[in-house]
Amino acid sequence: MYILRSCMEKKVLKIGQISDAHIGDDDRLVQDIDVRKNFLTAYNSESMKDLDLLVLSGDLADNASTDAYSFIAGVIKDSKVPVCIIPGNHDNLEVMEKVFDLKDKVHNGKCYYRYDLDGRSIFFLDSADGTVSSDQLSWLEQETAKIDGEVLLFLHHPPCLCGHKFMDLRYSMKNIAEVQATLSKIKNLKHIFVGHYHSEMTIQLEDKTVYVTPSTQMQIDPNITVFCLSSAAPRWRLIEWGENFMETKVYFSNTP
């Protein structure tokens, strides 16, 4: 958790992050877990009230089905706050485009964009294929250079190894070095929020902090090299971001 309080000129933004919901078809369980119930537990939790923005940071669906995306679309359609979405490695962007309003967010088959909120800028990248394309990296470097204040970044894959023995070994980002080279140039980026690893982790990457948000589907034991489910209870993140101020907390339900 990073906290630095000072005389703040702008309001503190409350951002909710839900990651790796892995919604299946119909009401079928995914790996014997009621993933729809888990998603609703997070979405309807008291911690997600009075948000300024909700971020769904990839792996919305388990098998990229229209039915899964339609379920999520039905849940968020009456949201009183904007919802920003990016795909993960289990998602299919073409199917997502048929269900969600991603107008002006998809470029050459990748979903990446900037979202401005209360005078601050939040960036979203597409790492669904396990990489962040050079086009996205060039765009990110150019766009962040136009901004005087601090920015936030969301993407699905962590741009670093995290000490997660199972995920680092099998499913880490494929072009970490290239991504880190670009990120190191962006001095007004201090906080990066990701998912993918089904664990809560906080990693220091030079002058930036990478916050790995756990899953609403299930959690994976980070301490062994083979897959081992450590919990089927949903977890999600609340971010409070102000001027020279960042506070973030992961919430969880005790019952799956």
UniProtKB/Swiss-Prot annotation:
For this UniProt entry, the molecular function terms from Gene Ontology, in alphabetical order, are: 3',5'-cyclic-AMP phosphodiesterase activity; metal ion binding; nucleotide binding
According to the UniProt record, what class of enzyme is this? hydrolase
Indicate which residues the UniProt annotation says bind Fe cation 1: 20, 22, 59, 198
Q: Does the keyword Transport apply?
A: no
> Would the keyword Plastid turn up in this protein's UniProt record?
no
Q: What is its EC number?
A: 3.1.4.-
Keyword terms of this UniProt record: Hydrolase, Iron, Metal-binding, Nucleotide-binding
Cofactor(s) required, per the database record: Fe(2+)
What Pfam families does UniProt report for this protein, alphabetically?
Metallophos
Any idea which positions bind AMP?
22, 59, 89-90, 198
Recite the UniProt cofactor note for this protein.
Binds 2 Fe(2+) ions per subunit.
| Sites where the protein binds Fe cation 2 | 59, 89, 156, 196
Q: Which family does it belong to?
A: Belongs to the cyclic nucleotide phosphodiesterase class-III family.
Q: What is this protein called?
A: Probable cyclic nucleotide phosphodiesterase Fisuc_1441/FSU_1912
Question: Which species does this protein come from?
Answer: Fibrobacter succinogenes (strain ATCC 19169 / S85)
